[in-house]
UniProtKB/Swiss-Prot annotation:
<comment type="similarity">
    <text>Belongs to the FliE family.</text>
</comment>
<dbReference type="GO" id="GO:0071973">
    <property type="term" value="P:bacterial-type flagellum-dependent cell motility"/>
</dbReference>
<dbReference type="GO" id="GO:0003774">
    <property type="term" value="F:cytoskeletal motor activity"/>
</dbReference>
<keyword id="KW-0975">Bacterial flagellum</keyword>
<dbReference type="GO" id="GO:0005198">
    <property type="term" value="F:structural molecule activity"/>
</dbReference>
<dbReference type="Pfam" id="PF02049">
    <property type="entry name" value="FliE"/>
</dbReference>
<dbReference type="GO" id="GO:0009425">
    <property type="term" value="C:bacterial-type flagellum basal body"/>
</dbReference>
<dbReference type="InterPro" id="IPR001624">
    <property type="entry name" value="FliE"/>
</dbReference>
<protein>
    <recommendedName>
        <fullName>Flagellar hook-basal body complex protein FliE</fullName>
    </recommendedName>
</protein>
C-alpha cells in the first residue's frame, strides 16, 4: 500500500510541476531592445577598464593583497574588451553604410 502512495505522491508532484511550467509559459516575456543590449555591453567594457585602472593604482601604491599578475590579467581583460567593442562598432558602421547604399 505504501508503494502506491509513493507513486501517487510522485504523480502529484509531476502534475504540480507541469501546471507551474504552463503558468510560466503564459507570462509575457520582457522585450530586450538592441539599444539596451548595446548600452549594457558598453557599460561592461567601462566597468572592466575602471576595475583594471583601480587595480593598477592599488598596486602602484603598494597596497597589500594586490599581485602583479592580477593587475596584468585585469589590464589584458580591459584591453581585449575594448578591442572587441571597437570591432563591433566597426561592423555596425559597415552594416549601416551597406544598408544606406541600398537602392529602394
Amino acid at each position: 500500500m505504501s508503494a502506491i502512495q509513493g507513486i501517487e505522491g510522485v504523480i502529484s508532484q509531476l502534475q504540480t510541476t507541469a501546471m507551474s511550467a504552463r503558468a510560466q509559459e503564459s507570462l509575457p516575456q520582457p522585450t530586450i531592445s538592441f539599444a539596451g543590449q548595446l548600452h549594457a555591453a558598453l557599460d561592461r567594457i567601462s566597468d572592466t577598464q575602471t576595475a583594471a585602472r583601480t587595480q593598477a593604482e592599488k598596486f602602484t601604491l603598494g597596497e597589500p593583497g594586490v599581485a602583479l599578475n592580477d593587475v596584468m590579467t585585469d589590464m589584458q581583460k580591459a584591453s581585449v574588451s575594448m578591442q572587441m567593442g571597437i570591432q563591433v562598432r566597426n561592423k555596425l558602421v559597415a552594416a549601416y553604410q551597406e544598408v544606406m547604399s541600398m537602392q529602394v
